Structures are given as C-alpha cells and as structure tokens.
C-alpha cells in the first residue's frame, strides 16, 4: 500500500496539470460548459475510463465554480478531491473548504450516469450544500436532487434519479430499507448504490456504526415486566448485588444479586431457558439505572426519552435503543413505556455503506481511526496538507483533583480572555456538563450562547456568530460541525478564537476536532483542556491511587506532559474498546447481511420478473423435497419413503387427481423425485389458471410471493435479534457465542426459506379454482380486498352496487364495448368474482351467528352507517335491533331492505365477537411455535 507521502506526490502532479489548464478554461463561454460535459459523457459511454478524465473534468469544474461562486479551488483542495475520487478518506482541517472539494469528484463520477450520493449529517447541511454547489452543477449541465424526510415518494424518486443527490445518512439508509419492502417496483425510489461521498465521514462511519437503522412495526406488550425489572433495579445494593465494569459499561449480578433476583421474581433457576427473557430485562434495567445518565446518553423532553449523539451532542430524532433498553430507560424515568415493536427491516451503517461500488469521505480528523477504516470499509485515510500553516497554540492540559476546582479555574480564565475581547468556544462532553458550566457562567455574570441537545434549533446561526468579538459560546462536543467560525481582522489581531475543552473525550479525534475550530486557514488561535479526576474518562481508567493523590491539590492544578500522555493512552484504550464493540456488532450483522442480500436480491428479481413460473417451480421443488422427508420413516434402521402417505398428501391438492400412483415413487433418488413432483405441481397450477389473462396471474403471483417473503423475513430477523440478545450466555457453557450464533442463525435462515416456499405453494394452490363446466354458484373463488378494489376501480362499480342485478347490467355494458377476446375473457372473470362476492355476503348473512366478521374497516364503517350507529363499542345488542327495525320501516325498495338486513347481521356478529374478546382478554396462554424453529416460547394475550 502506497504511503501518504507518495500518494500526495502523485496527486500533486494531477493538481498541477489541472491548474495548467486554467487559461484554456477561461476562454470558454458559459454555454460551452454543458457541451463539454456531454462530450465527457460520450467518451465514457464509448469505453474511456473515468479515471482518465480526472484532469479535464476537474479543470472544467474549477472554472465553473470560479464563475458561479467566485471561488478558485486551491491546489490542496484539488488534491483532496482526487483522494475522494479514488475511494479514500480525505482528512482536511477545519476551514480548508470541504464543501467545494466534494464538488469535483461528484461531477466527475456523475458523468457515468449511475448517480452520486453526497451524504451529510443533517438536513441543514444537505440543503445548504445543494443550493451552493447546485448553481455550479447547473452551469455544467448536471442535475441535482435534494432528498429529505417526509418527502412524497415521487419527489424522492426524482431526487435519487438526478445525476447528483444530496441526502442525510439516516434518510439514505431508511430509504434503502423501505425500497426493499415495496410490493410494486414503481414504488422504489433509489437506483443502484454507485458512489457515495460522505461529509464528516468519521461521524457517520465510526461514531454511528454502533446503532443500527431499524424499521419497526407491530408490537408486543411487556410493560408489566419492564416495570417489575425497574422495581428490582431500584432495590439493588450497588456495592453488594452488582459489579459494574466501568471500561465497558456492563453490569453483572453478583451471587447475592442473583439470589435477590430469584427471590424477587420467584424463580428457581435464573439461567433456565424459559427465564432468558426476564434475565435480559433485569440486565437492561440495571444498565438503565447504573450506566445511563439523563443528559449524557439521553434526554427527557415532553414525556419522551430521546437519544443524544455521544459525539456531537445532537438529538438523534426517530432513533431508539433496541432489545428493550429503550423501554428500560422509559421505566426508570417514569414516562410512558412504549410497547416493544417487531423489527421489520434493519441494517447497520457499516454494512449499508459497504454496498456501494465506491465509497469515499471527508472529515477534519480520521487518521487516528485509519485501521478501522481499512478493515471495515477498505478505505485509507490520507491527510491533506493545509493551504496555509497552522499557527494555533495548543497549550498543555490543566489537571485538577475535583471538577469544582477545574470549573473555578475555567471561569477565571474565561473572564481574563473575555476582557481582552477574544471570542471563546467552550466544548463539553454532555448536556449535563454544559448545563453545569452554564450555571457557573451565569453566576459569574457572563453573557453566553449555548448549544446542546435541549437547545439545538439555532445551532448553525449561533456557531456562525461564535467568532465575534467578546462572544462566549458553550457547545456539546462538535455541535455545529460543517459551519465555519469566521473571524474579523480585529479578532485576528487580538489572537483569534480561544477554545477551552472541559474534560477529554472518549476519542482523540473528537478533541482534535474541537481544537480545530480555532486556527482555520492560518488564523491565530489557542486551545486548552481542563481535566479533573472526577471526569468520566478518569474514573474509568485512572488508578484509585492516582485519583487520590490529585485530591491533595485542592484548587491547584498541574501541567504535566507525562500525565497528558497517560490521558492519551487512556483514550487509545477506550478507542480500542469502542472499535471492538463496533467490530462485534459487525461480526454478528455480517451473518444477517449475507442473508439480507440474498433475500433482497431474490425479492428484486420477483419485483422485476415478467414471468414467475421459474421461481414458483423452485419453491415447488423445495416443498416436494420437504414432503418426501416428512413422509419418510425409519424401517429396519433405514429411512424409507411411505409412498402411500406421500400420495395422499398431494393427490388432488398439489398435483392433478390420479396423476401418480404409489409405485411411481418407488426406488427414486430423493432430489430426482422432488423435481418430478415439482413439474407435476407446476402443470396442475398452470391448468388451474389457464383461463385467466397472463397479466392478472402475474400480479396475483407477485403479490402472494412477496407477502410470504416479507412475513417470514420479518419473523426471521425478529427471532435472530432475540437469539443475538441472549447468545452471550453461551460463554457460561464454554462455547464461542459468535460461532453458536452463526450456526443457529444459518439453520434459522434455511428454515425461513422452507417456510416461504411452503406458504407460496400452498397459497397459490388455493387462490382461484376454475372449472368451465361448473356454474357460477359452484365456483370456488377466494376474494381478496385488492382484487375487489381493482375491479371496482376499473369498472366504475361502487360497493353499493354489489348485487346480482347491478353487476350483470354493468358487465353486459362493458362486454358489449370490448375490443378483443382477451378483454372479454378478463371481464367475464371479473363478473364471476363479483357474483361470487354476492354469494359470500349471502352466506355470511345466513351464518352470522357462528362466523367471525372478517371485513375491513371501510366495510364495517359502511354497515354502521346503514344502521345509523356511531360507535359499536358503546352500543347494546338491543339498540342494534332497535336501529335495524327503524331503518327497515323506512326502506322503500327490496335493494335497500337487503342491505339493511346484511348490515344488521354483520354488526350483531361483530358485537358478539367484541363481547367475547372483552370476556377473554385478560387470560394469558403459553404458545409454543408450531414450526419448531428452535423452541422459541412466546407469551400471547388472547384477543
């Protein structure tokens, strides 16, 4: 691998060539830029490699930026832009012009026609950068899209299909997950993941890598268990019942703690399989109480627990801890406990960004994490030289025994600097810390602006003003990243921006980012950190002896290079722990990632296929093979097929009646027999849908295949998540948890594929059965809401017209106007379906006393409206009968009377269902999964 030095030397030559083309570019008229862009596109289309166009494309974009924005890219910016094009991370100091730098590789790679994504950490930066650079791209003849939250799908699709798309990291990931849940290819918004340029790459690819993106749905209620676990956590004696690993922030029960837990929950064995869930909830409750602090990891606002980004201090909107930890914190804070949701789709940032054909990024600090970038993303970190030398003075740390002493000295120094007039930026590690310092500043009578997770609305505005004379700005970590703090000449003459850090951060690069807010573009400046033995980092890593010796200092402090090195070593150790944690998340997610990619690829092929018979046949082979296995028995020590039993299970159900006799199955190799059975299944299925137009069959097949896919994939990731949550217990059995997880998750995935195949084959065998010799009444038609809605929409019928007379009249009219035989056949089938619906409604009337109501909300609302009932929940059976009799008296024709009778029968049946549910709602029943997927036991509330 080439060194930074050799890469910079090579890229410097590229940059010199680009600069040498400036006179030639100056000669171009404005309208020539789009023409030149098209020429470059044509050359790529004709086989020229995009790498060979770096010099020409960058020279063209540089001149365009100069004309539109008045900005002439420096050589170092061009070097940074070349680093990005070749798929690496460019470390560029604050103020070196990353926004302009990203313009060049975006333009060059957009010429391939495959799209470029420029990823930012928030929507403000996406909007700002798209507006600034969008003017340049417009001159170049390149389209720009802006993606954001709550945008309608058509606008999202338009944004993603632009040559260059600006978007936030979270929305980009969620759009990917949502795209892989659609049932119609037209509903997808993204195209291929070609090239991503990530602004603040360390924040996105490192800091947020531990928290996966999750789309949830459905819910399961364990509120009482969360409350019980929280009550137990409150009774725990911190010294006797638990051990807290301060380095990893894990909590473990001691022997006395385990005994207390067994007594509290009346359990004989805390580690028994059936108690895995409650043990997991206990540990979550202990974490919530003893390692998570309000104002540090999360904040409570308007009765909701909101996560705080540990590296930026921003609120992580829409994000929540998984595996029940969010609910444990809600129980601790006495706010409403949300019902735990089922994970419908999930992916980590690590695995998402590895899907891109090429990945690059920019940030002010990433070199300290280069090992992680190489191992996880296969990207190097190349440090760009600054345009002007850095003259900022980074003063040695002040170290104190107590926090109070550190803050007392900090306030003294702030007063001194403020009297001179230098602007001051105070960086803190948490909301709690910033609010503590705010109280000290207020007490000292100092005016200041504050940005933290509770006060982030004016973030960019406050940061942009932080370079004014006498300004004091208090911010959590790197709030305001992406917004420059610009200084007037007067402030520069005073010595520039002064940065004070209150305690060291978990990672050295975060400290460097804070320092880097001062001294941009060769400006003067100064930085210093105030450390105390009561800081979180010191509590976790400094020895008790060292902490005790510092307490003797009182209000005094020391400046020691030895101690500064010790702090740096502690940070390195913590960086290693955090990397291990992220690597651990990735190791487990890699298993799911392989399965997810396989599922999504097959799902995509189903969405785009013009014919699904090949897919269906594969499912039928799987089902046939499983049926052969299920119908085999051990006879004289050998597994032998019970041919009669197999024949009985498929004859007339999955294959044509009398298609096989038992002897056809004798002496056949299993896979050959499975293929033979699958071919017969496919023949049988094709015969059943032979009279239905191909487009209707394809739509029906696609809908049912995707429904089964999504149902069992959702179930798979939910079970895999629970499996992962408890897998660490394998350590106690001297097993490797990851190896066990791989084995069990693979077995689970194989079963999931079998479940999907089984359901698809079963559902398709029952959808529509047509026999031309049978009359309408004897045809068996399964009617779905989608089919009915499509027919109503295409024919102009309404739900009020669902009677034999209106249906026949409408279809006679439409058939008379039909242009071809295929349309006539389609209309005839639709007529049969609608007449079948009338029969189903009549049957429902006749059997409403012992049938459940399976109508949708709209149909039920219509029935209630017919009888004039507002709310069935507050209505008695007698009132329903009374309303029915009133309406029947007012009815003027048989059609209206018929509807009133149907409405009465349906509403009474629904009323009886509700009463039954109310009666049984409190009973709990243990349900063991019928599919035997590893003995998962769930508590299900009846009703």
Curated annotation (Swiss-Prot):
It comes from the Bacteria. It is a peripheral membrane protein. Its EC number is 7.4.2.8. Pfam families: P-loop_SecA, SecA_DEAD, SecA_PP_bind, SecA_SW. It catalyses: ATP + H2O + cellular proteinSide 1 = ADP + phosphate + cellular proteinSide 2. The keyword Metal-binding does not apply. SMART domains: SecA_DEAD (SM00957), SecA_PP_bind (SM00958). GO terms for cellular component: cell envelope Sec protein transport complex; cytosol; plasma membrane. Keywords: ATP-binding, Cell membrane, Cytoplasm, Membrane, Nucleotide-binding, Protein transport, Translocase, Translocation, Transport. It is found in: Cell membrane; Cytoplasm. It is an enzyme of class 7 (translocase). The keyword Protease does not apply. ATP binds at residues 77, 95-99, 484. PROSITE patterns: SECA_MOTOR_DEAD (PS51196). One of its GO terms (molecular function) is protein-exporting ATPase activity. InterPro entries: Helicase_ATP-bd, Helicase_C-like, P-loop_NTPase, SecA, SecA_DEAD, SecA_motor_DEAD, SecA_preprotein_X-link_dom, SecA_SF2_C. GO terms for biological process: intracellular protein transmembrane transport; protein import; protein targeting; protein transport by the Sec complex. Monomer and homodimer. Part of the essential Sec protein translocation apparatus which comprises SecA, SecYEG and auxiliary proteins SecDF. Other proteins may also be involved. Belongs to the SecA family. Part of the Sec protein translocase complex. Interacts with the SecYEG preprotein conducting channel. Has a central role in coupling the hydrolysis of ATP to the transfer of proteins into and across the cell membrane, serving as an ATP-driven molecular motor driving the stepwise translocation of polypeptide chains across the membrane. This is Protein translocase subunit SecA.
């Amino acid at each position: 691998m080439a060194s930074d030095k050799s890469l910079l030397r090579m890229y410097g030559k590229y940059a010199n060539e680009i600069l040498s083309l400036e006179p030639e570019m100056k000669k171009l008229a404005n309208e020539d830029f789009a023409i030149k862009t098209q020429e470059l596109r044509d050359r790529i289309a004709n086989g020229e490699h995009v790498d060979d166009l770096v010099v020409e494309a960058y020279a063209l974009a540089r001149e365009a930026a100069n004309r539109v924005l008045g900005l002439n890219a420096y050589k170092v910016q061009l070097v940074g832009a070349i680093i990005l094009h070749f798929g690496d991370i460019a470390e560029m100091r604050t103020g070196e012009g990353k926004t302009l730098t990203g313009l060049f590789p975006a333009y060059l790679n957009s010429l391939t026609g495959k799209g470029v994504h420029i990823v930012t950490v928030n929507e403000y930066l996406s909007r700002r950068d798209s507006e600034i650079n969008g003017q340049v791209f417009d001159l170049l003849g390149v389209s720009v899209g802006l993606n954001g939250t709550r945008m309608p799908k058509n606008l999202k699709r338009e944004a993603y299909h632009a040559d260059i798309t600006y978007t936030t990291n979270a929305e980009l990931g969620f759009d990917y997950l949502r795209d892989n849940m659609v049932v119609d290819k037209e509903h997808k918004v993204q195209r291929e993941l070609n090239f991503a340029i990530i602004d603040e790459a360390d924040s996105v690819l490192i800091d947020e890598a531990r928290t996966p993106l999750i789309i949830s749905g459905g819910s399961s209620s364990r509120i009482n268990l969360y409350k019980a676990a929280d009550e137990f956590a409150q009774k725990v004696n911190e010294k006797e019942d638990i051990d807290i690993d301060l380095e990893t922030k894990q909590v473990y029960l001691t022997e006395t703690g385990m005994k207390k837990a067994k007594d509290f929950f009346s359990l004989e064995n805390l580690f028994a399989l059936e108690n895995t869930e409650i043990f997991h909830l206990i540990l979550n409750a202990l974490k919530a109480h003893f390692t998570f602090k309000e104002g540090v990891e999360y904040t409570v606002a308007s009765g909701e627990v909101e996560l705080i980004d540990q590296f930026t201090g921003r609120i992580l909107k829409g994000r929540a801890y998984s595996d029940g930890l969010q609910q444990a914190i809600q129980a601790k804070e006495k706010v409403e406990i949300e019902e735990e949701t089922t994970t419908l789709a999930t992916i980590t940032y690590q695995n998402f960004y590895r899907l891109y054909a090429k990945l690059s990024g920019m940030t002010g600090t990433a070199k300290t994490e280069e090992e992680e970038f190489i191992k996880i993303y296969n990207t190097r970190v190349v440090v760009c030289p600054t345009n002007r030398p850095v003259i900022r003075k980074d003063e040695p740390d002040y170290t104190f025994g107590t926090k109070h002493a550190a803050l007392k000295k900090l306030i003294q120094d702030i007063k001194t600097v403020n009297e001179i007039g230098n602007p001051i930026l105070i960086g803190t590690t948490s909301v709690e810390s910033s609010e503590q310092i705010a109280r000290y500043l207020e007490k000292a009578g100092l005016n200041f602006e504050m940005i933290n997770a509770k006060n982030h609305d004016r973030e960019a505005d406050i940061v942009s003003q932080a370079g004014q004379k006498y300004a004091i700005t208090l911010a959590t970590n790197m709030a305001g990243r992406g917004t420059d703090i610009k200084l007037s000449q007067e402030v520069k003459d005073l010595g520039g921006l002064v940065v004070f850090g209150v305690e060291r951060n978990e990672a050295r690069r975060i400290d460097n980012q804070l320092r880097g807010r001062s001294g941009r573009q060769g400006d003067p400046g100064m930085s210093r950190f105030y450390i105390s033995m009561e800081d979180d980092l010191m509590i976790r890593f400094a020895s008790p002896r060292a902490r005790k010796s510092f307490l003797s200092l009182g209000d005094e402090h020391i400046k020691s290079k030895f101690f500064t090195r010790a702090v740096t070593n502690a940070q390195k150790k913590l960086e290693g722990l955090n990397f291990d944690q992220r690597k651990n998340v990735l190791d487990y997610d890699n298993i799911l990632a392989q399965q997810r990619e396989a599922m999504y690829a097959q799902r995509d092929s189903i969405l785009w296929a013009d014919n699904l018979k090949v897919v269906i046949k594969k499912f039928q082979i799987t089902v046939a093979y499983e049926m052969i296995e299920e119908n085999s028995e051990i006879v004289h020590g050998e597994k032998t097929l019970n041919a009669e039993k197999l024949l009985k299970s498929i004859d007339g159900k999955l294959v044509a009646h009398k298609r096989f006799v038992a002897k056809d199955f004798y002496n056949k190799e299993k896979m050959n027999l499975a293929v033979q059975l699958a071919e017969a299944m496919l023949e049988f299925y094709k015969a059943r849908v032979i009279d239905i137009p191909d487009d209707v069959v394809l739509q029906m097949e696609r809908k049912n295949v995707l429904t089964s896919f999504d149902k069992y994939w959702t179930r798979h990731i939910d079970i895999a998540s629970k499996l992962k949550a408890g897998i660490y217990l394998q350590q106690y059995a001297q097993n490797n948890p990851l190896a066990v997880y791989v084995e069990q998750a693979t077995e689970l995935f194989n079963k999931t594929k079998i479940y999907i195949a089984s359901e698809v084959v079963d559902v398709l065998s029952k959808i529509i059965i047509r026999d031309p010799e049978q009359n309408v009444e004897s045809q068996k038609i399964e009617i779905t809401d989608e089919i009915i809605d499509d027919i109503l929409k295409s024919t102009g019928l309404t739900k009020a017209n669902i009677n034999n007379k209106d249906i026949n009249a409408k279809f006679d009219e439409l058939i008379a106007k039909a242009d071809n035989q295929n349309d006539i056949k389609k209309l005839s089938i639709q007529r049969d379906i609608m007449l079948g619906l009338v029969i189903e409604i009549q049957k429902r009337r006749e059997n409403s006393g012992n049938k459940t109501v399976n109508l949708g909300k709209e149909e039920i609302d219509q029935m209630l409206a017919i009888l004039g009932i507002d709310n069935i929940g507050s209505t008695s059976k007698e009132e329903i009968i009374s309303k029915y009799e009133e309406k029947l008296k007012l009815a003027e024709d048989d059609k209206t009377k018929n509807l009133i009778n149907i409405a009465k029968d349906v509403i009474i049946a629904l009323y009886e269902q509700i009463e039954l549910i109310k009666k049984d709602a409190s009973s709990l029943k243990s349900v063991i999964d019928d599919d035997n997927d590893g003995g998962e036991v769930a508590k299900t509330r009846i009703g």
